[in-house]
Amino acid sequence: MSAYSRPVLLLLCGLLLFTISIAVLNTLVPLWLSHQQLPTWQVGMVSSSYFTGNLVGTLIAGRFIQQLGFNRSYHCSCILFALATCGLMLTVDFWSWLGWRFLAGIACALIWVIVESALLRSGTLTNRGQLLAAYMMVYYLGTVIGQLLLGIVSTQLLSVIPWVGALVITAMLPLLFAQFSHQSRHESPPIAVWPMLKRRSARLGINGCIISGVLLGSLYGLLPLYLSHKGMSDASVGGWMALLVSSGIIGQWPMGRMADRYGRLLVLRIQVFVVILGSVAILGNYAMAPALFILGCAGFTLYPVAMAWACEKASADELVAMNQALLMSYTLGSLAGPTMTSLLMQRYSDNLLFIMIAGVAFVYLMMLLRKPDHQQTPYAAV
């Protein structure tokens, strides 16, 4: 029996539309603020408020789904995101956009947890990997489409918000024709996240998720600003962002295969080294396209490999808590990355974006080069 049932396909269609809207706004919001002459640190704070919303959404998602179920919670989250998007049209100022992007971040995190949980509940032990792989591919595909749209349509605020809002409302429609059952509140014991964060065998994996959050949060939030300050148009910025995310899509399968065959520790070391190499290449004004490509290949695949490392020693009943801990770690990194990096960029130079990325990657590489107390050659379970 195929893993891709009718409800699953409809859910993924809704996710695709929702992700396109996220990608468009994540690129244009920093550019719109920059066009209004807001300082770089304020642009970074608005990006961080979005990731703060992600953290809050992650924490409340379980109870939200428990109370409303998958379908109703999905629809409510879409409505919240649409309202937060339309609110951007009211006024362009730091404090109001800080609030709107915070609400948008909550809605996005809710959608991610809802979709992931619905897919896991729909699948079996033999096809959950296929479902989550499809989820990741749809997410990145939607991100690329969103970036490419910036080269086709007008990027003016009052032109973009109406059709993005309509796209989010359209993303609600597929789940009107699909029903997902949800877990009752008495079906499983409460999840304890804190012991997972303190687990010694998972430390390098958790650190990897934090580093991945710093890296991707900074790239998503501040790379458009970096490129804009280089004199690029909004359409060109969208094209470069599409290249970055496309390289992440291309890198998913080979990195996963390498981790299975050669061990996750070796692959993590290679990934982090390539992140440093790509950052140095951009700082050295070498060819932008190949440098950004290898940076995306390594950076966008770091999180799943680190997550797999951390989950290796977790028992079946600990996986949910461990995954929640890893998502929280990633979100905290995504929150800290744009905040610290934007302040450094404002005070010194835009080049601090890639100096920061290379610096945190180097620190993690030093951790990985030490003898791990996890296991000598960590392989995925077959």
UniProtKB/Swiss-Prot annotation:
It is a multi-pass membrane protein. Its main location: membrane. One of its GO terms (molecular function) is transmembrane transporter activity. InterPro entries: MFS (IPR011701), MFS_dom (IPR020846), MFS_trans_sf (IPR036259), MFS_YcaD (IPR023745), MFS_YcaD-like (IPR047200). It is found in: Cell inner membrane. Keywords: Cell inner membrane, Cell membrane, Membrane, Transmembrane, Transmembrane helix, Transport. The keyword Protein transport does not apply. GO terms for cellular component: plasma membrane. PROSITE patterns: MFS. The chain crosses the membrane at residues 8-28, 41-61, 73-93, 94-114, 133-153, 157-177, 208-228, 235-255, 265-284, 289-311, 325-345, 349-369. The keyword Lipid biosynthesis does not apply. PANTHER family: TRANSPORTER MFS SUPERFAMILY. Belongs to the major facilitator superfamily. YcaD (TC 2.A.1.26) family. This is Uncharacterized MFS-type transporter YPO1380/y2792.1/YP_1213. It comes from Yersinia pestis.
